[in-house]
Each structure stands twice: as structure tokens, then as C-alpha cells.
Swiss-Prot record:
It is found in: Cell membrane. This is ATP synthase subunit beta. ATP binds at G153, G154, A155, G156, V157, G158, K159, T160. Disulfide bonds: none annotated. It comes from the Bacteria. It comes from Oenococcus oeni (strain ATCC BAA-331 / PSU-1). It catalyses: ATP + H2O + 4 H(+)(in) = ADP + phosphate + 5 H(+)(out). GO terms for cellular component: plasma membrane; proton-transporting ATP synthase complex. The gene is atpD. Its main location: membrane.
């Protein structure tokens, strides 16, 4: 193995000098810096600067590094443990356990985090819908098993709560394996999620990988690949159906932007790295289903300043089968989950996949909500009295639909005191069909807010009247 020395340290960037007569390490190779206290720092090769110098990104703090320290080339990219040994554990970007448990034995298989995407002839597509128990998702933007879904939203509109509810609903009803990857998010949320999953019994079928907000950009940029490598092994070696949760894919882009600037690359639009589309493609193309098994991916996507044209969310859009857009104006109306039913999309919402009845009800719901949106200007200026009888009916039913798209979440029960509701897709379709048909025009609008099934809305109406 080649041995070099630290030439200079600029924050998380470390330049390493190798002897002229030695082969330089390859791009993406992991190098180990020997610290004075005997510990090792892992750094990853990014650029060959010439004159036997390589520029690297540190995966941990570079505090205490000095010029002249020894650096060893491992001869391979970062390798992380895979397989059954990862279940029930929490790892960092290097695949080291951070949950206080036993170290992973050396006998456990390890795979490099940098790998090629599956070949075209290995891919498989599915038309099976994944039931989530969340009405607005199951009705209007159904998720495909083996598909990729994005939860888009600005700050504080409920992306993490929604992804936690999806983990609660799908992971508990799903007998397969789940991999949760926390990319640049709050450590407190990761800690809470670990203990909640432990208490609910889901943890034993879950591997968790965290690279949180306080970590250097190198760790945040690579932690997504660590989680994905673990998910790929369950898919390829064991033929499992894997659920891959990523919170938050924007932080992956953000970390890449930080690293790009530190490496001296000229930024592109809005200050992002010029390699944004390439980096996103390399990650997203590996999240796919093959003939051996499937990876169903649900990714939270932060939208900076609620601007969907920002290059980071705009680049992510292109890779997804379904999008769930969270809207701030709905949170202001107290409608949770604050999913925008008109902006959210899914390639699975076709009669061939969801069935004629479901498709008919979903398109009618969207039609009513769209008409209501168009009539809102007239209502705000002239009032309801200026509408025709038909328009008044549309508005009244659309408001009931809007409230009925909300529901209480199990993961929010400790804050709201309202038990969470899992609503089967048949009950969801039936409930909205009854509202569209006018069966519940006599019930107060408030009865439809924050309930599960249509029967619960009827029950709530009786309580409101009494």
C-alpha cells in the first residue's frame, strides 16, 4: 500500500503528498490518516492535483491534523458491512456502529459504497400498488412497490412526520427489510426514531444509517451511498423486497455543493455544484428494482424557500415515479398531512393499475378541487351568493373533500392526543365516492376534519350536533 503525508488541511479538505515513484491512489479510494493518539481518520480521494498530490474529503472532523502526518492508501473505496448483521443497528457513514452495541465482526461481508447501477437487462418493473393507509396518498398519488417517491416541501410543513408515519404504516405491515438513511437532518429526530422503532418492534428488521447536520460535508455526501449499499445487498444477495427511506435527499445535494466549493470547482446556477445532475443520477440510478428483488424508495426532499424551480428539487423530480407535494397554505388551515392534491402526481394513477372505480373517484375528486380553486377568487370578492346552485354544490362538496383528505397520524398521537388511523384503500375510495355522490351534504364540514373512515365522520357529526 502506498504511504503519503499530509501536505495541507483546509477545513474538511486534506491534500496528501505521495512519493514520486509510487502509484497514486485511485479516485474515490479511502485513505487512513494516523493521528498522534493512535486513532485513524478516513479521507476519500476526490482530485489528482498533479505532482503526486491528491486532494481528499474528510469523513470526520480534521481537528488535530498537522502537516507531515502519515497517510495510508487502503487500495479500495470505503467499505461497509452488509447482510443480516446490520439489522437492528445504527451506523455512521463508514459502517461503524454508533448505537453503543458490539462492534461488527470482521467475518461479516463488506461492500464498497461506490458501485455501478444495475445493467438494463437486470431491471424489473412492477405495477403493484403499495398501500400506505394514508388517504390522500392512496387515492390521488398511489405509490408503486419497487418505485421511487419524493415527499417535497419547505421548512416545517411535515415531511419528516409523513415519512415517520409511512415507516410506521408500511414497515410494520411489511415483512421485508427496511433501511433508514438520515442525511444531514436533526440528531434529535434520529434519536427519537431509533427509540420509537425499538419500542414498536420494527427495529429488528431495520438497518439505520445516520450522517447528521453536525457532521462534515464529506460524511453527509456519502452517507446516502452507505445506506443504499446495505439495501442493495438485501436485494441482490438475499432476493428481498427492501424499503429504503431517505431523509433528506436535499442535504445530499447541499453537502455536494459545500464539497464542490471547497475543492475549488466553479459553481453553476444558484451556487450549486456543476456536477449536480451527475451526482444525483449516480445515486438515484442505483435505487431500482431488479429481477432478484425490489427496492421501494421514499425520499424526503426539502424545497428551499418553497421554490420548486430551485435546481436541487428540480433535478430530483426527474427520477421519481410519484411525488407528494406538501403545501404551506394547507398547514395554515390546519389540514394535516398538508399534501397538495392537485400538484402531487403518480405514474400509477391509471385504470390499468388502480382499477376503473378508483381512477374515476380520484379524477372526480381532482375535478371538484380544481373547480373550487377556480371559484375562490369569485367567492373572496363577491361572496357565495353570486354562485349558481351547481357551483355552490361543487364548493360545499370540495370543502368536505379537502377536510376528509386529512387524518390523524399514529406518530403524532403523543402531541395531539388523537389516535392514529390506518385507512385501507377500499374504505378510502368508498368514502370519497359517497361525498361526491352527495350522501353527506347534510353533515357539517367540521365533521370531516381529522378523521379516518367516512363512518368516523358520520359519528363525529352526531357528537357535534349533540
Amino acid at each position: 500500500m502506498a504511504e503519503g503525508t499530509v501536505l495541507q488541511v483546509i477545513g474538511p479538505i486534506v491534500d496528501v503528498q505521495f512519493p514520486d515513484n509510487k502509484k497514486l491512489p485511485d479516485i474515490n479510494n479511502a485513505l487512513k490518516v494516523q493521528r498522534i493518539d493512535g486513532s485513524e481518520l478516513t479521507i476519500e480521494v476526490s482530485i489528482d492535483l498533479g505532482d503526486s498530490v491528491v486532494r481528499t474529503i474528510a469523513m470526520d472532523s480534521t481537528d488535530g491534523l498537522t502537516r507531515g502526518m502519515k497517510v495510508l492508501d487502503t487500495g479500495a473505496p470505503i467499505e461497509v458491512p452488509v447482510g443480516e448483521a446490520t439489522l437492528g443497528r445504527v451506523f455512521n457513514v463508514l459502517g461503524e456502529p454508533v448505537d453503543g452495541g458490539d462492534p461488527i465482526p470482521n467475518s461479516v461481508d463488506r461492500h464498497p459504497i461506490h458501485r455501478s447501477a444495475p445493467k438494463y437487462d437486470e431491471l424489473a418493473t412492477s405495477t403493484e400498488v403499495l398501500e400506505t393507509g394514508i388517504k390522500v396518498i392512496d387515492l390521488l398519488e398511489p405509490y408503486l412497490r419497487g418505485g421511487k417517491t419524493g415527499l417535497f416541501g419547505g421548512a416545517g410543513v411535515g415531511k419528516t412526520v409523513l415519512i415517520q408515519e409511512l415507516i410506521h404504516n408500511i414497515a410494520q405491515g411489511h415483512n421485508g427489510i427496511s433501511v433508514f438513511t438520515g442525511v444531514g437532518e436533526r440528531t434529535r429526530e434520529g434519536n427519537d426514531m431509533y427509540y420509537e422503532m425499538k419500542a414498536s418492534g420494527v427495529l429488528k428488521n431495520t438497518a439505520m444509517v445516520y450522517g447528521q447536520m453536525n457532521e462534515p460535508p464529506g460524511a453527509r455526501m456519502r452517507v446516502g451511498l452507505t445506506g443504499l449499499t446495505m439495501a442493495e445487498d438485501f436485494r441482490d444477495q438475499e432476493g428481498k423486497d427492501v424499503l429504503l427511506f431517505i431523509d433528506n435527499i436535499f442535504r445530499f445535494t447541499q453537502a455536494g455543493s459545500e464539497v464542490s466549493a471547497l475543492l475549488g470547482r466553479i459553481p453553476s446556477a444558484v451556487g450549486y455544484q456543476p456536477t449536480l445532475a451527475t451526482e444525483m443520477g449516480q445515486l438515484q440510478e442505483r435505487i431500482t428494482s431488479t429481477k432478484k428483488g425490489s427496492v421501494t424508495s421514499i425520499q424526503a426532499v426539502y424545497v428551499p424557500a418553497d421554490d420548486y424551480t430551485d435546481p436541487a428539487p428540480a433535478t430530483t423530480f426527474a427520477h421519481l415515479d410519484a411525488t407528494t407535494n406538501l403545501e404551506r397554505s394547507l398547514t395554515q388551515q390546519g389540514i394535516y398531512p398538508a399534501v397538495d392534491p392537485l400538484e402531487s402526481t403518480s405514474s400509477a394513477l391509471t385504470p390499468d393499475i388502480v382499477g376503473e372505480d378508483h381512477y374515476e373517484v380520484a379524477t372526480q375528486v381532482q375535478h371538484f378541487l380544481q373547480r373550487y380553486k377556480e371559484l375562490q377568487d369569485i367567492i373572496s370578492i363577491l361572496g357565495m351568493d353570486e354562485l349558481s346552485d351547481e357551483e355552490k354544490t361543487i364548493v360545499n362538496r370540495a370543502r368536505r373533500i379537502q377536510f376528509f383528505l386529512s387524518q390523524p397520524f399514529s406518530v403524532a398521537e403523543q402531541f395531539t392526543g388523537v389516535p392514529g388511523q390506518y385507512v385501507p384503500v377500499e374504505d378510502t375510495v368508498r368514502g370519497f365516492k359517497e361525498i361526491l355522490d352527495g350522501k353527506h351534504d347534510d353533515l357539517p364540514e367540521e365533521a370531516f376534519r381529522n378523521v379516518g373512515t367516512i363512518e368516523q365522520a358520520v359519528e363525529k357529526a352526531k357528537k357535534l350536533e349533540s
